[in-house]
Amino acid sequence: MTMLKINDLCVNYGMLEAVKNVSMELPEGKVISLLGANGSGKSTILKTISGLKDSRQGEIFFGDTKINGMEIDKIVDLGISLIPEGRRLFPYMSVLQNLNLGAYLQSSKAEIDKVRAEVYEHFPMLKKRANVRSSKLSGGEQELLSVARGLMSRPRMLLMDEPCQGLSPIMVKEIRKTIRALNERGLTILLVEHNVSIALGVADHVYILRNGSIVFEGSPSELSTEEFTKKIYLAG
């Protein structure tokens, strides 16, 4: 079953075409990696799906619902959660306070407490450090907090923008483990990456974006790491 479908998507920044006639289908319950160099349009696609950026052309469907032009909170309410690049935490707020900001769609304190308890099952370290300022966490811990905050809206799909950027090999391994664990619990994940080994290590399906256009779609097993890298950076 297809969870998200993109048809002929075009997105501009002024006169610059950032995304050019992109079509994608994301099956439910899978991890899909969107690979590309910096500036290839990967993050723009995530922003457009999540309502942060308007499209010039094309359609985006979440299930049977067209979400182009929909308000951000309505997109979140449908079940889409964006984990932005750079974490975007509030440094002077505690872990607990940052988490609660992700629960603004929940109707009561009891509901927030219930969802937070579910999230803590995935991230017991965050429960132990609930009253610590997020600025006191390591980069990897901050990334885990960013993911945890995204889960507070009880999404069906996670959009993850470069979650391993700037992290140590140990924390990269932890993030990859987290992605797989969340997927095994039923979450569909669209992972944006420029690092081939990270993307292929968790993906069920891969798209490669170059200069705003899809140049490859297929299984991680279809090409070697070297061949994937060439497709990202070299035309032809």
Regions inferred by a protein language model and the residue ranges of each:
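ABC-type ATPase nucleotide-binding domains, specifically the catalytic core motifs of the NBD
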Residues: 14, 32, 70, 95-114, ...
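Conserved ABC ATPase signature
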Residues: 133-137, 141
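Helix-to-loop junction immediately C-terminal to a conserved catalytic motif
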Residues: 50
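Catalytic Walker B motif of ABC-type/P-loop ATPase nucleotide-binding domains
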Residues: 158-162
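ABC ATPase C-loop
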Residues: 150-151
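Conserved ABC transporter NBD signature motif
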Residues: 58-67, 78, 111-116
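The feature captures the beta-strand-to-loop junction immediately N-terminal to the Walker
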Residues: 35-37
